[in-house]
Regions:
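Short alpha-helical segments used as structural interaction elements across diverse proteins
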Residues: 2-3, 110, 244, 418
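Extracellular and organelle-lumenal recognition/adhesion modules and their flexible linkers in secreted
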Residues: 18-193
Length: 604
């Protein structure tokens, strides 16, 4: 997906001169049948023709887009680049009728992107999680966002594979204003005692500035966390700048004053272990981090202090080591995994197994959303398993036994990744692949704690959705989403480590969240009876409540509305899902420049 996003950005920039004042010829009525459709752009390796037969409706026109020859780019783009016009500050439903030819590997995806001033990225979505593969005409749609500051809207169709795609009746339909004034919910009279309890019992956090090392305000955490050897730090979404800052400061405190020496990321094990070498170099810290940690974090400037801090510890008696527990490739050094194959001796891997793995890695890199066939899955998994087993057997006599064990685990994860790529989406509930990925991440984290970093205390950086436990008990308050069959990483870890793992979730009252590649509207006001409204009424900019220490029957041990999971207002006895919550009154985004609001930085 990162490759497609980057390429679409470059495509849009290259086509800036072609930008129109508004969407044009969405129903293909302009121009003659059999000709190129007016107003649309595509690469020279593709041919587009207007049709009036075989379309989605008897009286409609449509377009065929077809690859020419075999020398094709990673994907084709049939698109328009327009001024926002009346779409500005609107939620916009983007839809089209699409079908693809029945050719192996043939896929299509609707895509929509907004560009902001100074070449900043706005909203982006490309159906990478649900590509179009049906030969039947079907209507596809999603709701996009055009920010008030947007300078350009880019939209169209992506083609994957050497095939022919048909499309018709593209539509851009405003669904309502994107940004509305924030109106504080009115505190209910019956909730006043709860606010008073928070004022007296919540732990005030003086600052979230990661550069501020006066940790007097964090001292209560020593008693709360106690002997836990794993502390999991969640986040509501992957664009929560204030949460990131708070986590970075917590990491410094846990490392310097509580003996936590490992930082484990929701990123690839192979990538993050290799990243350690880059951190220990002259490369800029954030650039080095991008070799291992997903770009949703490392493309933002707010993360720089953390990686510079990690670098500063490497020559000390207690360096902060970094690792990952995800089975996915996450960094910019995927070619390094291919080089590992070249370096494996004949006694470890046959040429056939090397080639099978090599072909699969390249297919994943070349085709976003690549889904192996059953035969490809079985072949790649078998090859990865044989290589992993051979590496483990040879570890005892290897020149570098730990390196051999590291590579064995990496190939084991690769086999799991191949299976993950075969997963599909249900019509309702949680994504079917989430439990598989979460279970593997949980098993990996337990392995890190009990084996790879045995005797070390570990800090976990991940989404709150992954570190939660007892997810089935969460009332999403949505008909189309439930967690009843969702086995999370946090559940796996909790069942193995129990109270040796302490989990902190985060939430916010107001503000804005966005990662470096997307822009989101400001947060909507929380419910009047929500935990966030109670915290806000208590008047603390930052505060933490320890759920573990609450007595039975406490009001926080009852179902409450809170939004730690993607800012959706869900209901649960959150004390059964997390061990603590850290509240931020005002959220701010993780921008490429790493800007923060006035007053956040307290270190002089």
């Amino acid at each position: 997906m990162k490759i497609v996003r980057r390429a679409l950005l470059m495509s849009a920039m290259a086509a800036a001169a072609l930008a129109q004042t508004g969407p044009r010829n969405l129903d293909f009525r302009e121009g003659a049948v059999g000709e190129e459709p007016a107003g649309w752009n595509h690469q020279p390796q593709y041919e587009a023709r207007v049709l009036d037969t075989g379309c989605h409706k008897p009286d409609a026109r449509c377009v065929s887009i077809e690859a020419k020859g075999n020398d094709l780019p990673p994907f084709g783009s049939f698109s328009q680049f327009v001024a926002p016009g009346d779409l500005r500050n609107q939620r916009v439903k983007f839809s089209a009728w699409v079908r693809v030819t029945e050719v192996p590997g043939c896929k299509a995806q609707l895509w929509f992107r907004t560009d902001l001033p100074d070449n900043a990225a706005g909203f982006f979505y490309n159906m990478n999680d649900r590509p179009i593969t049906s030969p039947e005409w079907k209507l596809y749609e999603f709701v996009a966002q055009v920010q008030p500051e947007a300078v350009k809207v880019n939209f169209g169709l992506i083609l994957l594979g050497a095939c022919k795609v048909y499309a018709g009746d593209f539509k851009l339909e405003p669904q309502g204003i994107l940004e509305t004034p924030f109106v504080d919910p009115k505190l209910r009279t019956e909730d006043a005692p709860k606010v008073e309890w928070l004022k007296k019992n919540a732990i005030p956090i003086r600052t979230i500035d990661p550069a501020d090392d006066d940790f007097a305000d964090l001292q209560p955490l020593k008693k709360i966390i106690g002997d836990a050897r794993v502390v999991q730090l969640g986040e509501q979404s992957h664009g929560d700048g204030a949460t990131f800052y708070a986590k970075e400061r917590l990491i410094r405190f846990l490392h310097e004053q509580m003996g936590f020496d490992v930082l484990a990321w929701e990123s690839g094990f192979y990538d993050c272990e290799e990243m350690n070498q880059a951190i220990d170099s002259d490369m800029p810290a954030l650039e080095a981090a991008q070799k291992g940690v997903f770009g949703i974090w490392t493309r933002g400037g707010l993360m720089t202090p953390l990686f510079e801090y990690a670098r500063s510890t490497l020559k000390t008696a207690r360096p902060l080591r970094q690792t990952g527990f995800d089975i996915q490739f996450s960094g910019s050094n995927q070619q390094g995994f291919l080089k590992v194959l070249d370096d494996l001796g004949d006694g470890i891997a046959s040429d056939a197994d090397k080639q099978t793995v090599r072909d699969t890695v390249r297919a994943m890199a070349r085709t976003p959303g690549y889904k192996p066939s059953k035969e490809e899955e079985m072949a790649a998994q078998a090859a990865a398993t044989r290589i992993a087993e051979a590496l483990r057997k040879s570890a005892g006599s290897a020149r570098d036994p730990r390196r051999a064990q590291f590579l064995a685990k990496s190939f084991e994860d690769f086999g799991a990744l191949v299976h993950l790529r075969t997963q599909t989406l249900p019509s309702q509930g949680i994504r079917a692949d989430f439990s598989f990925r979460d279970i593997k991440m949980g098993e990996n984290l337990i392995w890190l704690a009990n084996d790879w970093y045995k005797g070390k205390k570990i800090i976990v950086w991940a989404a709150s959705m992954h570190v939660t436990r007892n997810a089935a008990a969460i009332d999403t308050r949505m008909d189309t989403l439930n967690y009843k069959d969702y086995r999370t990483m946090g559940q796996v870890v909790h069942e193995s480590l129990g109270k040796a793992a302490y989990t902190i979730t985060f939430t916010a009252y107001r503000g804005k969240s966005a990662n470096p590649s997307t822009s989101q509207p400001p947060l909507m006001p929380p419910a009047a009876e929500s935990v966030e409204t109670l915290f806000h009424a208590a008047g603390m900019p930052y505060a933490l409540v320890d759920f573990r220490g609450l007595p039975e029957g406490h009001w926080l041990r009852t179902p409450m509305i809170m939004r730690p999971l993607g800012y959706a207002q869900m209901k649960s006895d959150w004390t059964t899902n997390f061990d603590a919550v850290l509240f931020t009154d005002v959220m701010f985004p993780n921008t490429p420049a790493g800007t923060v609001p006035a007053g956040v930085k307290t270190k002089k």
